[in-house]
Amino acid sequence: MKFVAFERAKQGTGASRRLRISGKTPGIVYGGEGKPQLIELDHNALWHALKKEAFHSSILEMELGGATSKVLLRDVQYHPFRQLVQHIDFQRVDAKTRMHMKVPLHYKGEEESDAVKLDHNLVTHVMTELEVSCLPADLPEFIEVDLSGLKKNATLHVNDIKLPKGVKFVSHGKLNPVIVSAVPPLVSEEPAPAAEGAAPAEGAAAAAAGGKPAAKTAKPAAKK
């Protein structure tokens, strides 16, 4: 994806506020061989770009001052309750340096799996994105996971999926975490109906006959 940014001369709270009022979003681009540079972007164009998955997970082409450079989206600050992007950060990409990036997982074939078609399992996508390490040229926009072979009560782990060439999974704690699980549907247990012709309890029989249940017989007094 490609977007246009403009050089920003002024910084500070007041300058940023005036930018937002004029329909612009303040930002910064850093990293690589260049110095950190203040930028500004058209807010409406940025707002629509942020709705696209690729803007968050792929290498972007930023046009700035007549030159184009490759960058990654690194941070977005939103207003707490208004539809407003308050600030945005981009990082320059070095073609020879491995990078860490979260890549979306795209699942397919779930409805054709035995777990769903035959056993009516409930399939849970435990993970929706994967943090990976790779060179910029090897960064995938997304990783596709085929669930058509999923069996009942099965779990799928990171090691069960094939990562693109040059891409490695970055672990934080668990070396092989679960990404998908299939479990049987919950079945509510209903009370079993009374057997036909079964005799009702003594008290219930008396109530059904219109009378009151017989009182318990008093015990005889103990002899002195």
Swiss-Prot record:
An example Gene Ontology molecular-function term: 5S rRNA binding
One cellular component (GO) term of this entry: cytosolic large ribosomal subunit
One Pfam family here: Ribosomal_TL5_C
Keywords in alphabetical order: Ribonucleoprotein, Ribosomal protein, RNA-binding, rRNA-binding
Stretches the record annotates as Disordered: 190-224
Biological process per Gene Ontology, one example term: translation
Subunit: Part of the 50S ribosomal subunit; part of the 5S rRNA/L5/L18/L25 subcomplex. Contacts the 5S rRNA. Binds to the 5S rRNA independently of L5 and L18.
Function: This is one of the proteins that binds to the 5S RNA in the ribosome where it forms part of the central protuberance.
Family stated for the protein in its record: Belongs to the bacterial ribosomal protein bL25 family. CTC subfamily.
Protein name in UniProt: Large ribosomal subunit protein bL25
Encoding gene (name): rplY
